[in-house]
Amino acid sequence: MKQLQLLMGMPITVEVVDPSVTEADIENVFAYFRAVDDIFSMYKEHSEISKINRGELCEEEYSDEMKTILALSEQTRQETRGYFNIYHNGIADPSGIVKGWAILQAANMLKEAGFTNFYIDAGGDIQVAGKKGGNPWRIGIRNPFNRKEIVKVLAVTDKGIATSGIAIRIIQLLRSRISLA
């Protein structure tokens, strides 16, 4: 069963290859992504991150999810020597960490529900488990300068894949580096 929904400002596809999967199983994954969006959306006034950025919440009031993401963000900032930094002009934007983390959490939900063959794609970041039709999942990598062209096909099982065009990487690196000044 395969479904697509627009959540967190991006298309999210969930496909589970198992005869016992139900629409409710897939909906649980989408409900999880909606909950993540309610916590971390920079565009929702009521989100936890928006309240934090407005100074309306103190650290003791942060959700466990927020504490986890802030710790991961700090770890990543240290590992990249500051090139990845969620803070810019006093505002925290953890979206660069949240998407990948949320995909892994959603994959764990499916595994805990007993599913071993599935695909989750959230805005181009992908997590696969098991196989599709007895074969590894086939993931096409697009040319960043010609989105109609597939430059590489990966055959994968039990892997995560994230790609980005070089122009996007440069902007992210420069923005993060500038935020350290």
Residue ranges of model-derived segments:
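Mature catalytic core of soluble alpha/beta enzymes
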Residues: M1-A181
